[in-house]
A protein has these predicted regions:
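Glycine-rich, low-complexity intrinsically disordered segments
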Residues: 1-101, 105-135
């Protein structure tokens, strides 16, 4: 196995009223607010074909996560037995990549308004992908 490192460059940041990961919803459908994805101008051409109403998968880097954690109580509830992080949606994990299903509300230049996003303000954006139908 090749363990060579590699670099990911954020393409933008989240603007959200959420500021504390501890009090943010665990999933967007659990009360995640509308938020803005603010993209770097260098990637704006990549938005071609994205429209209001489109469902997207947003990939983020959960920069406040603890990358040393390998076992957690699911949903941070100590009444739940400990599990390995790869069997949970915990942000704490060796490579804290966030996966967020969102819907585009509006697009204003480099700013995309999306619904139901549980990511906190300032979270780096790695990528956006369309949700595709069944093949």
């Amino acid at each position: 196995m090749n363990h060579a490192g590699f670099e990911l460059t954020p393409i933008g940041r989240v603007e959200s009223p959420l500021t504390d990961p501890a009090t943010a919803p665990k999933q967007g459908h659990e009360g995640g607010p509308d938020a803005w994805l603010v993209l770097e101008t260098s990637v704006l051409e990549g938005l071609e074909g994205i429209r209001p109403g489109d469902p997207l998968i947003l990939l983020t880097w959960l920069d406040r996560a603890d990358r040393e954690v390998l076992r957690v109580h699911p949903r941070d509830d100590v009444s739940n037995p400990m599990r390995g992080v790869f069997g949970t949606r915990s942000a704490d994990r060796p490579n804290p990549i966030g996966l967020h299903p969102v819907e585009v509300i509006s697009i204003d230049g480099e700013r995309i308004r999306v619904s139901n996003l549980e990511a906190v303000d300032g979270t780096p954006i790695l990528d956006l992908k369309p949700v595709l139908g069944e093949p």
